A protein has these predicted regions:
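Short, polar/flexible loop-turn hinges at active-site or ligand-entry regions and domain interfaces
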Residues: 12-17
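Hydrophobic helix-and-loop "lid/oligomerization" segment in the mid-to-C-terminal part
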Residues: 32-148, 153-184
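Internal alpha/beta core interface subdomains
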Residues: 19-32
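Short, small-residue-biased leader/transition segments that mark boundaries at the very start
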Residues: 1-8
Length: 184
């Protein structure tokens, strides 16, 4: 998204040709990619956002794009409420019921806003297997941890699924993978 802002800034497209909704769509991509300018954010990111703002992007309209509904918030908090601390600074949630993938990912993100949490893992039942969503502030490489369970991603955002396994079995494997990660 920052790259698209650069395209406009380098005037490959005339500023007068950019619609407000286009500038807002690009700005919303930056907000999403950087998790509200807190992750992978540098000077070029802020420059692109400022440029899009000058093109007419309304930050309040962008914020409204990300508003959820009450039921979604309650679902996230129901997940967060079940979090257990592992190794003092890793939040782990193991749900025995099915869950929406987006809700699980948002809950994993939100767990990182709690003081002292360096990484979060949300495991939930899906059919005869388990889906996993993991987040980190960067100090813990969640990709490496989830690779041990067949997942992938990057150091701060990872996910995966394991078939023919219970949530309890997946949680045990996750805790083992976390221990192995910290032993190395």
């Amino acid at each position: 998204s920052r790259g698209l802002g650069d395209v406009y800034k380098r005037q490959l497209v005339e500023p007068s040709d950019v619609l407000k909704c286009e500038a807002e769509a690009l700005l919303s991509g930056i907000v999403l990619d950087t998790k509200n300018f807190t992750n992978r954010t540098g000077g070029r990111t802020f420059e692109a956002a400022a440029y899009l703002r000058r093109l007419g992007a309304d930050t309040q309209d962008v914020q409204r794009m990300f508003q959820g509904d009450l039921n979604s918030m309650i679902a996230r908090y129901d997940i967060i409420r079940q979090a257990e601390l592992y190794r003092d600074d890793i939040a782990v949630v193991a749900l025995d019921e099915e869950c929406d993938r987006v809700t699980a990912a948002k809950a994993a993100d939100e767990l990182l806003t709690l003081k002292g949490i360096r990484a979060s893992f949300v495991l939930y039942k899906k059919g005869d297997g388990v889906y996993m969503s993991a987040r980190s502030l960067g100090e813990v490489n969640v990709q490496v941890i989830l690779e041990a369970l067949g997942g992938g991603g990057n150091s701060t955002t990872a996910g995966g699924q394991a078939d023919n396994i219970t949530v309890a079995e997946a949680k045990a494997k996750l805790l083992e993978a976390i221990d192995k990660y910290f032993e190395n």
